[in-house]
Amino acid sequence: MPTRQTNNFTQAKWIWAQQPEYTLYNRWVEAQKEFNLSDGFMQAHILVCADTTYRLFINGERICDGPVRFYPEHVRFDRLDITKSLRAGDNNIKIIANYWGCKATTRIPVHAGLIAEIIVDNEISAFTDRSWRVRNGNWETNTPYSSFSLGPYEYYNAEKGEESWQQAVELFAAHEGPWQDLTPRDCPFLTADSRELKLVQTRKLPKRAYWYSFPFTRLIHKVPNVGAKILPSGGAAFTTIVAPTDMEISYRSFILEIYINGIKMESTFKLNKGDNFVSFISPRPNGFQADDPWFLLEDVRAAELKYRNPSGSEGMFCFIHPKASEETRNMPNHPPRDEELQTRIMEGLTKLRRLARPVDLKELEASAEYSFTSSFSPTIDPHIPAIFDAADSDATEYMYDLGTQSIGYISLEIEAESSAEVVLYMIEYITEEGIRQHTIQGNTYYRNGFGLKVPAGTTKFRSMKRRSGRYVVVSVKGETKIAGIEMEESVYPIKARGSFECSDSYLNKLWEISARTLELCMEDTYTDCPLYEQNFWVGDMRNEALFAYNVFGGYDLTKRSLKLAAESLDHQDLIVCCAPRYFTEIIPIWSFLWVVALKEFYLYSGESDAVLENWAACKTNINNTKTYINEEGLFDAPFWNMFDWGEIDWMGRRVVLFNSIMLGGALDSCIELCEVTEDQEFAQECCEYKASLITAVNKYFKNGAYPDNTDNLNSGSQIT
């Protein structure tokens, strides 16, 4: 007999398809269950969650995408009313889930898993367990990162035959495993509004080879979640390129040093007829971007080249890395700096350059200094924005204009006469000269699109990732037709409550642009931008919230953002700059602005409950700053002491006066909040603390100004 249900999971298990490991990179699963309902049911709800993202269907209808971002210690699941989606008789529930298995600055993946429970008239009618049918999805798993914040690049292979359904594997009971404190989502679901796309350009594209990306971090650490560490883990890939004749081919690359036959290349592959030993060296630590380096040959003749693994194994490349890098595998995600280990790793990376020539690979396999991988293939990376036209081509490019920037989910309908490949990407801006602002150029690094492989016939596909841009560019090969394209905008459901109008049309337009920009930066938290990062930066949140209060309200979004940031105190002694994030970096003035934002939320909303809910975190955040006060009474810490992208932000100073000044501002806000919480004892402590900071800071007030920092305790900085 079904168990009577509360508003949390009671019977459901975390499930997945059978895997050799459940922390592998970029894994997809489809799960479904049939269940029967009798006539006359009144109300139905579903509880659902996944690590890392999911899409829910009921009786073939897409219901929602989720979940919101969260820390694994404080999981937020979704609870939806699905009464209108169910029917008497047989029903089907289907969930597609994607476990990222990699570092990101918007999510913290820890273990593949999905969970669901359906409650009809307060009784459980279905829940995830081993009775569910599951199979691996048709998304390719061997893809590069889309960016450091948004997980793996999406590449769907509709040509794959669908796997047979298997029995699900039960991983954990609902409230066990690596996910803790399961509570319902604390902000509304995003909108689903259709946006019109207008075809504005069609052009032919040249034949060209793939863009090859190297998963160096995954090759070194094997278990990809270890790649969430900001630790050195570079290496070198080797291949033999067989050229049909002497040729020079221009190339682009990111991070890699490239040597051919022992000679370092700068912008051109200089190949001799026959065999050429090629080394791709990544001689720097991994970090936000450096563990996914790539290269691209920009010439149609690249298709004539053959690749052969010099080790004799299958796969295009072999790989080596310093064995010292492997010592990072069991370190915590944000370890103390180990100077000795870093030195050994960096020395090993430097020595890789001497191997940039034909070498006896048997020596490498026997090396005590290096680890050798005899064979690997680069990741699938079809995201190649074309930057020139060509008359003789095997592909056509179509560019669509949304009119203004948007963010959401793209759907395509493709009609192909034979097997074909489709590549889609989005951009924000095109200059008057027609130059496109691509999202991969210089140090900018975001594959803002997806790849799709389709068989002959009609294929319909809806991307699983939210993307942003104004222009949508689709490239298709062969006799292939784009039968349909749609953009479903997905943002926070704003309610217009403020307006602005004056006699200056320029100012009116500025208001409209600002309001639209804010709307695109409101989702399950405030975000820094809709395209590149979609990160929840605490300092940005404070400023965005102030604008939102007058324009849209958005109090619930601010409340959620404040709470999510407060939960970072499980990982650091001050509120972090960006949450949730695979490493816990602190920008002190943003830790302080969180306190200011809490006060401002109360002043605008009048909701004292949010203050009380976050009061313990507020006091912890303030009290822990005392451990960073030096003998001179100033805030002194080795953090990212940023203010506003000035020169001082990058100088590595421990003592910068704006930190102490902003801490004083946070104490001011805290004193005001003490009236709400009736915590007079803490108010007195904050008053005394603030007075001591004022005394310490004012020692450096000279000639009508404060210096940015103190070079030492006896003299002011020359930077003001």
Where are these regions (language model features)?
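Glycine-/small-residue-rich "gating" segment that lines the acyl/pantetheine channel
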Residues: V595-L598
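Short, well-ordered beta-strand elements
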Residues: S279, G664-L667
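Active-site acid/base region of carbohydrate-active enzymes
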Residues: F127, E433, E479-I513, E519, ...
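Extracellular/oxidizing-compartment recognition motifs
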Residues: P2-D528, D540, D556-K559, I575-P580, ...
